[in-house]
Amino acid sequence: MAWNIWGHSLPEMETWITSHGFPKFRAKQLQDYLYRRYIFSFDEMTLLPGPMREWLKENAILEKPVIMSHITSNDGDTTKLLVKLSDGSLVETVCMHHVYGNSICVSTQVGCAMGCIFCASTRNGLERNLTAGEILAQVYAFRELFDAPIHSIVLMGAGEPLTNYEEVLRFIRLVSDPGLLNISVRNITLSTCGIVPMIDRLAEEGLPITLAISLHAPNDTIRNRILPSSRHFKIEDVVAAAHRYFKKTGRRVTFEYILIKDVNASRENAEELCRLVGKMNCHFNLIPINGTEHIQLFPPSWKDVKIFQEILEKHGKSTTVRRQMGDEIQAACGQLKRRYLEKK
């Protein structure tokens, strides 16, 4: 049976290669062709002997993801790709171009089951989990377009990473592998809706990644409206899990807070949020919502955003307001895929 050779560690590749009678060092050569040179044709892997290349054609699967669409913002700061996988599934990935290097935002599932009211990816529910190789392929798709260093990885595209736990962990270990991209795990951020037992499990993995939790509200009433899946875990329990993660890993947790006019962006909401987290060492990433024609939700005024931020900082909380990158190219989760499908 043919084996898909994309998305495997060097030890896994060595085991497969040697089990079929080839020298162990050929695995490293093959891995270099795949991940350092991004070559998908066995015929072009000329360091491998001819008989091995012919054997690979018969016994290995190597399918290159297809970029179906890509668009870059007017200011050049954001590029979004729509990538077609081998089974025809479409996933989005975004590259944010910073002065210190590129930050790649990847999807971990096709579709999403979380039901966030502001997200287009969840409209049709969850289709399937992505494999570690399929997540990795999104990162490498940008290698075709940009010859620039990748500084950081953000698991913040379509899907809930912690419900695809094993493949997401495999991806993190692959992308941080010195033989692949060698991204420091400290430059990897995993964003979750707050699945409490999985946060505790992640804390035990010994991977000091940054944890970002989609909080989006100061209480359960508002949070359940914005994020229906949050009904499974009380907001106080989510915050407590974040605190345990910090104590176990030493990594400060980021709370993502999307600001929606007349929903969760008032002075009272800010004060309640401060009471919720108490003296916890954390960071707030404030995100004025991306308004679209498909949802009747709008960002607060810039003045109200600053007031919200100032209240948090008055209580000693570290905050940032996310740069509005990619608005005009529909860079919010799921929007490029939706537009592509509407045109078909």
Identify what each model region corresponds to.
Residues 90-95:
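A short loop-to-beta-strand scaffold at the N-terminal edge of the catalytic core in hydrolase folds
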